[in-house]
Amino acid sequence: MSKLVIGLTGGIGSGKTTITNYFLALGVEIIDADIIAREVVAINSPALKAIAKHFGDDYIQADGQLNRPLLRNRIFSNKADKLWLNKLLHPLIRVNIVTQTKEAKSPYCILVAPLLIENNLLELVDRVLIVDVNESTQITRTLVRDSSSEQEIKAIIASQTSRAARVNVADDIINNDDSPLSEIKEAVLSLDKKYLTLTKMV
């Protein structure tokens, strides 16, 4: 069991995946909240059946998987539906996160959760690492990566915790605006040493 759980988060397009991969290369175990969220609605899962019963069979694709775009559009414009879905999925996701952090074998592990703050997961981690960028960087990167429009990206940014609020809960921050990859790697190496030192104090 890891002695320390680091919560890694940041807004859309902040570069969380890049940072995560650097830690992974150092042998740090990664718990990915997005992967867990997909697993709890796997084909024939109780949660997926509950979604089909509540929203209708249109929300299940021909191959038996969840129709994510359809559901995403539904809950983005309907607060009541979003609340219902969160009440269904969040407890399941939380249980899986706790299980995986307990099973982690590296001295410290990292929980990557884009909505670490929004979904009240802070109590599951010992420290918070924020990948920080300005909004223009978020928009530019996401436009390149996704098929979303600038308006859609801005709506997602507006729905997430503000940059200031994220920084306010941070124990550690990596600025990923215009820094060269060599500097980002150095920042990760420095934090790795710091976290390993902290595990010896637990």
From Swiss-Prot:
- Which InterPro entries does the annotation name? Depp_CoAkinase (IPR001977), P-loop_NTPase (IPR027417)
| First-level EC class | transferase
BP-aspect Gene Ontology terms: coenzyme A biosynthetic process
Q: In which pathway does it act?
A: Cofactor biosynthesis; coenzyme A biosynthesis; CoA from (R)-pantothenate: step 5/5
Instruction: Kindly list any coiled-coil regions of this protein.
Output: none
**Binding of ATP: at which residues?**
13-18
Output this protein's name.
Dephospho-CoA kinase
